[in-house]
Regions:
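Transmembrane alpha-helices and adjacent helix-loop boundaries
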Residues: 1-248
């Protein structure tokens, strides 16, 4: 079979069937964008919860993170695929299970999963911001929510950009789990091609297409890491009365 990797006829057949690969590439990109948005919003919310004074909010964040970090993503997606339609039938009162589109399964699966990891990144970033920033903001009349929104989170995202991009990379690669539920993604299309023709060229094309998505992100991570090492650690917030605040 390995000798066939260099077979011109097999490559010709592969190139003649690139349409499904590009369709899968498009589906994967859509799942990546939607999953990233979901994981960023939910992860930020959970990250803030984990640093609040409320025991209830901290507990919600902790339970969520522990559950998603300690159960496999394929199991989570398969569970949503099998149980989700019955759950929707129960809450909507439909006569039969409500079908969930593979795209929805995909972005919910990777989005909810990576929100747990992003929340930990957010929490670490928030804890890296001097606590005096929050106290100084509140002394200037900011509510706690306003202090998070205008003071803490902007600094947090500057600190955590490199690890955040790493999570984006992992999310891209984890979209391949959609192949388990016939999601129409890149991995699913590649599996179909290899099953039909028996040519490993399908997986080579799949790898190259994932590389097209992931390599620019990897370069962005390296660039951000260099920038973060060059950037001065002090943060000036002139105009808000919060510049040069030291950690309490």
């Amino acid at each position: 079979m390995l000798e066939g990797l260099f077979d011109a006829d097999r490559w010709s057949t592969t190139f003649q069937n690139m349409g499904p690969f590009w369709e899968g590439f498009g589906v994967t990109l859509q799942v990546v964008v939607a999953g990233l948005l979901l994981s960023l919003v939910l992860g930020t919310l959970l990250g803030v919860f984990s640093t609040t004074r409320s025991r209830v909010l901290r507990a919600i964040s902790r339970v969520y993170v522990e559950f998603y970090q300690n159960t496999p993503l394929p199991v989570q997606v398969l569970f949503m695929y099998m149980a989700g339609p019955q759950f929707l039938q129960a809450i909507t009162g439909a006569d039969q299970p409500v079908r969930i589109a593979p795209f929805v399964l995909g972005f919910l699966g990777v989005g909810l999963y990576h929100a747990a990891y992003i929340s930990e990144v957010i929490r670490t970033g928030i804890e890296a911001v001097p606590r005096g920033q929050m106290e100084a903001a509140q002394s200037q009349g900011f509510t706690r929510a306003q202090a998070y929104w205008y003071i803490v989170l902007p600094q947090t995202f500057k600190i955590i950009l490199p690890p955040l991009c790493n999570q984006a990379l992992n999310l891209v690669k984890n979209t391949s789990v959609l192949a388990l539920v016939a999601g129409g993604d890149l991995m699913y299309r590649s599996d179909n091609f290899v099953s039909l023709y028996g040519y490993l060229q399908g997986y080579i094309v799949c790898c190259l297409m994932y590389f097209i998505i992931c390599f620019p992100l990897a370069m962005l991570v390296q660039w951000l890491q260099r920038r973060s090492q060059e950037r001065p650690r002090g943060v000036s917030l002139a105009g808000l009365g919060l510049d040069n605040v030291e950690e309490a």
